[in-house]
Regions:
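N-terminal transmembrane hairpin
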Residues: 53-55, 62-98
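N-terminal ordered "arm"
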Residues: 21-65
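Active-site helix-to-loop segments that bind/position phosphate- or nucleotide-bearing substrates
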Residues: 2-10, 15-18, 24-25, 46, ...
Length: 313
């Protein structure tokens, strides 16, 4: 099966997120089209220029080098997922950005106090969004909301983890444990997060930055530290969609639910540029980070989400 979603509005277009989720598929390139085959049978084809993310969730997939190179040249992210939709690897384009070298130098020279202030603001916004989700789901939210006001520079008291423990037990019950290797709810969360993370990594590369140089995440084995930093505040959007499914007795990673999670990228948020879909707000956020590093004056264009998700989720 191939899942392919495309959306266009008056200002911007996020091209298709193409998922290959069945075994024994061969992905090749022909005359500007990405072609999906099983043996010699063509199952489908998508214009190369229409793809923004190639998501490989099946394990028995063969992809030609020509496809990977061409996708990278088109600023497309390729995501390789393991069991339960945990992303294990992303293939990232090296953007031909006019200020690529300068931006990376600014990343390297970014001061610790500056990064700690950025992380503080990220954590505050994430916790506020978590409190909003609890409120919308008619759960106790005021204590989580209060925690957001207690976050210090660099979150030295680890208020993020404290809020998370309260958040998950309130949202899905005391017996729920967030486990990336888990099934059911956890697998749905993994899938949604993988899509968000890939979109954020694409915005980072488009801005002439390298995702390995994070603000707070610094695991030596993680090549996407900066993407993991900046997509934290978007996680609660996925959480709410998964909660809506779960509350109706549905926690299967079905084609319908995958499409609902992918469509989260088109949920409207408020930015300094006006109302924007999530994926576009990521570009605004990362560009504001680039400008803040350059000017050494922190002014990030954080997306403000009002909790609205489309009715067809």
């Amino acid at each position: 099966m191939i899942i392919s979603i495309q959306c266009v509005d008056n200002k911007v277009m996020l091209n298709r997120i193409l998922e290959i989720n069945e075994e024994n598929r061969y992905i090749s390139l022909s005359r500007g089209f990405v072609v999906i085959k099983q043996n010699s049978e063509i199952l489908g084809q998508v214009p190369l220029e229409d793809i923004s993310v190639l998501l490989l969730t099946a394990q028995g997939v063969t992809v030609s080098k020509n496809v990977l190179n061409s996708l990278a040249e088109n600023n497309c992210i390729t995501v390789l997922c393991g069991k339960n939709y945990v992303p294990h690897r992303m293939l990232l384009p090296i953007a031909n950005h006019c200020f690529y070298t300068k931006n990376i130098k600014n990343q390297i020279n970014c001061s610790e106090p500056f990064k700690k202030k950025v992380w503080q603001q990220i954590v505050i916004q994430k916790i506020k969004n978590q409190a909003l989700v609890l409120k919308l789901c008619k759960k106790e939210y005021k204590l989580v909301e209060k925690i957001a006001s207690l976050v210090k520079s660099g979150d030295t008291d680890n208020r993020e983890a404290y809020a998370a423990r309260m958040y998950w037990s309130s949202l899905f019950g005391k017996n729920f444990k967030r486990d990336k290797n888990g099934e059911g709810i956890n697998s749905l969360l993994n899938y949604g997060y993988a899509v968000m993370r890939a979109s954020m990594a694409r915005s980072i590369c488009s801005a002439g930055l390298i995702p390995v140089l994070g603000v707070n995440h610094n695991n030596n084995l993680n090549q996407f530290c900066l993407a993991d930093d900046f997509f934290e505040m978007y996680r609660p959007i996925i959480d709410l969609i998964v909660y809506e499914k779960w509350s109706k007795g549905d926690q299967e990673v079905s084609s319908e639910n995958k499409k609902a999670l992918i469509k989260a990228l088109w949920i409207n948020v408020h930015t300094k540029q006006g109302n924007s879909p999530v994926f576009q707000s990521m570009h605004y956020l990362i560009n504001s980070y680039v400008q803040s590093m350059e000017s050494k004056n922190l002014s990030l264009d954080f997306p403000i989400w009002d909790g609205v998700i489309n009715e067809d989720f």
